[in-house]
Amino acid sequence: MAFNDNPAHVAALNQLISELEADGVKIVDKRGWFWKALHYIVLVVTFGGQRDFLKGYYTTIAHWIGVPEGWDERSAASRFAVLKHEYIHICQARKLGFGNAVVGLPLYGLLYLLVPLPLGLAYFRWRYEREAYVIGIRARLELQPHLRMRLIDSAIKQLTTGRYGWTWPFKRTVRRYFETHVPEATPVTEGDLQLVP
């Protein structure tokens, strides 16, 4: 638990984790040879634009959510939003795999990484990430409504730079999308939180 974490946020996070685990989702540390190899591949493919893959980024592969060092030190509100975002990627892979994320992974990976281009105009990555970012931002705003513009700015920075392989490099278009799809939020009570979509 992060220092001075809000108990209601911790309760919401714990409930979400329980629901995800019941749905077959596995939260794993990004340690070991597989994640290190993936880090170097990402580093090369993004021409050095993504240097924080192991320490600052979350990665979903089928029904596994890889979390970086320091996961447990992040605020409950941040972890809640991240898990909501990453769960959307699991749902996207499941749609392509007839309900099974592992079956959907090859097609999902192909679309996410290569169509129509791997860098610069990655339309499916833009579609998949914008959906997940909207859900993640909305989830964070349920707990911390004052962060709206900061979270939108962060999403824009991620999706229009080398961090995500210049997914959709049109900053004004990306900003307009998020400002339209992420409404101003008001705090909700614990009973009002929608945990798993």
Predicted features, each with a name:
Residues 1-66:
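Auxiliary, metal-adjacent structural segments of Zn-dependent hydrolase domains
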Residues 58, 64-83:
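Short pre-active-site segment immediately N-terminal to the catalytic Zn-binding motif
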Residues 69-70, 96, 115, 138:
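Membrane-embedded catalytic scaffold of the fatty acid hydroxylase/desaturase
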Residues 36-47, 100, 104-116:
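Short hydrophobic helices that act as membrane-entry/anchoring signals
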Residues 5-9, 13-17, 104-197:
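Metalloprotease/metallohydrolase-associated module, dominated by Zn2+-dependent proteases
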Residues 70-72, 86-107:
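Catalytic Zn2+-binding segment of zinc metalloproteases
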